[in-house]
């Protein structure tokens, strides 16, 4: 991922209202779709909370302070300060902390971008899946920034609190296999692993 500037991508407006509020992008769905849409969003948000690096309501300034001394590639997800968006990724780049909005439309999440590029960006049913995709994509850092370009890497999440040993083990297992039900483990433990199938 590449940014031409290290300037924040969203303004430091007041705290956003909760997702699903009247007038937000998700409210454009037909009336018959609203319960299903709400259920999808609720499931996505619950999964995001389970990840441990969703900070909820946090201003641009607070995110910058949290990331200021972190290594490049450290990131967190928070509620967007912009009323048209649900969430924002705040990440430490080589030029300092910056922000990238997450767009939600027609039941899919994708990174916000300029119109001519937006249609080419991958879309995901899950915020965590979106983050995982870009974390894995950023593992091979072969490009060298040039011409004032700032490359944006997602490497390491900034947790709200230290994750439990169980959760860390779950992530490690996910990095090794996706065949959870083939593992010689008790069913209850397999169910726990199934609750979070990501590598980040």
Name each region found by the language model:
Residues 1-43, 139, 156, 160, ...:
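Eukaryotic low-complexity, non-globular regulatory regions
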Residues 101-106, 113-200:
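Cullin-RING E3 adaptor/co-adaptor recruitment helices
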Residues 54-61, 66-73, 80-84:
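Eukaryotic beta-rich interaction modules
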Residues 35-65:
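Eukaryotic proteins' extreme N-terminal regulatory segments
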Residues 39-45, 96-98, 102-115:
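Short aromatic-glycine-(Arg/Gly/Cys) micro-motifs in beta-strand/loop hairpins
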Residues 73-97:
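Short, structured protein-protein interaction patches enriched in aromatics and acidic/basic residues
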